[in-house]
């Protein structure tokens, strides 16, 4: 399950940079959510 990624995907679908930030911060937030 990836609630954070799933919600961020449609919102930042046009912002690839934001997605990278989510991945980097995801490691600090929830590695399982980002990796999943």
Curated annotation (Swiss-Prot):
Which residues are the propeptide, according to the record? 1-21, 34-36
Lipid moiety (S-farnesyl cysteine) attached at 33
Q: Could you cite one Gene Ontology molecular function of this protein?
A: mating pheromone activity
Localization, UniProt: Cell membrane
The answer to keyword Lipoprotein applying to this record is yes
A GO BP entry is: pheromone-dependent signal transduction involved in conjugation with cellular fusion
Chain ranges passing through the membrane: none
Q: Which residues carry this modification: Cysteine methyl ester?
A: 33
Keyword terms: Cell membrane, Lipoprotein, Membrane, Methylation, Pheromone, Prenylation
The primary location reported for this protein is membrane
- Classify the protein's membrane topology as the record does: Lipid-anchor
Q: Does the keyword Transmembrane apply?
A: no
Q: Which InterPro entries match?
A: Mfa1/2
What's a Pfam family this protein contains?
Answer: MFA1_2
Q: Name one GO cellular component term.
A: extracellular region
What this chain does, per the entry, is described as:
The active factor is excreted into the culture medium by haploid cells of the A mating type and acts on cells of the opposite mating type (type alpha). It mediates the conjugation process between the two types by inhibiting the initiation of DNA synthesis in type alpha cells and synchronizing them with type A.
- State the protein's name: Mating hormone A-factor 1
By which gene is this protein encoded?
MFA1
